[in-house]
């Protein structure tokens, strides 16, 4: 089956997804049909890109908005005269982890719930996403230079797929919170939960045998664990009495996600700049195609004169 077929469709379903093991330690070798392997997305998809930069935007989504933002970012990168930073982009339902490819230093960790839009600028072979800042409510557009158009498409579809899974986790967390609040009001316990083991009522959680706590403690990249103070740790693991693992979702992140959801065409799906034709094209690709040169034969840095 084509490698990106499931990414272009309705993606992975829950709650069966929550029963899959999350091997949070090492990144496994990418299978040929990676989108048909649920554990691969849960573990995290890794892409090698070049970071163009960031600019602020006024709205959480929009094709023209993102195109203009990317144009500003590219112009700034060209004017700087510096070589682009090689980065590793890891995408999972938890979010995007950005690290320096040379030093393995953590650059940024963005929760998937803060991302409002992503797109692939086909002519420029650029992947870009818009996310709400962790420090304030400003919206940032980050752009990355890909080796070819098909990679930009693959990253875009992967982020959209991860968002779909994360949204389902969020729905579970909301339902779990409502059950606990109702049980608290009635003075009773919800079957299958232990009130002395759960977070406070101000915290939303998603439960299920999602991942092994010991594995989660192992950073996916060696330096990520050393830089956890710089990471957005709004999602934290907790263990219930039935050995299920909990995703905590603090009120600030919950509010940000709810607000961004209102701006989406479909609250359950991350808006992308891909057309049906783009998605169909991406569905015909496999990871082995990413290493093949484009028919144009131009090196990407030559196109941008970097």
Swiss-Prot record:
Residue(s) carrying Phosphoserine: 14, 197, 200
Gene3D superfamilies in the cross-refs: Pleckstrin-homology domain (PH domain)/Phosphotyrosine-binding domain (PTB)
UniProt KW keywords: Acetylation, Cholesterol metabolism, Cytoplasm, Endocytosis, Lipid metabolism, Phosphoprotein, Steroid metabolism, Sterol metabolism
Region Disordered: start-end pairs: 178-204
Cellular location(s): Cytoplasm
Location of the region described as AP-2 complex binding in the Swiss-Prot/TrEMBL record: 247-274
Molecular function terms from GO: amyloid-beta binding; AP-1 adaptor complex binding; AP-2 adaptor complex binding; clathrin adaptor activity; clathrin binding; low-density lipoprotein particle receptor binding; phosphatidylinositol-4,5-bisphosphate binding; phosphotyrosine residue binding
Free-text comment on this protein's domains from its UniProt entry: The [DE]-X(1,2)-F-X-X-[FL]-X-X-X-R motif mediates interaction the AP-2 complex subunit AP2B1.
Purpose of the protein: Adapter protein (clathrin-associated sorting protein (CLASP)) required for efficient endocytosis of the LDL receptor (LDLR) in polarized cells such as hepatocytes and lymphocytes, but not in non-polarized cells (fibroblasts). May be required for LDL binding and internalization but not for receptor clustering in coated pits. May facilitate the endocytosis of LDLR and LDLR-LDL complexes from coated pits by stabilizing the interaction between the receptor and the structural components of the pits. May also be involved in the internalization of other LDLR family members.
The name this protein goes by in its record: Low density lipoprotein receptor adapter protein 1
Lineage, broadest ranks: Eukaryota, Metazoa, Chordata, Craniata, Vertebrata
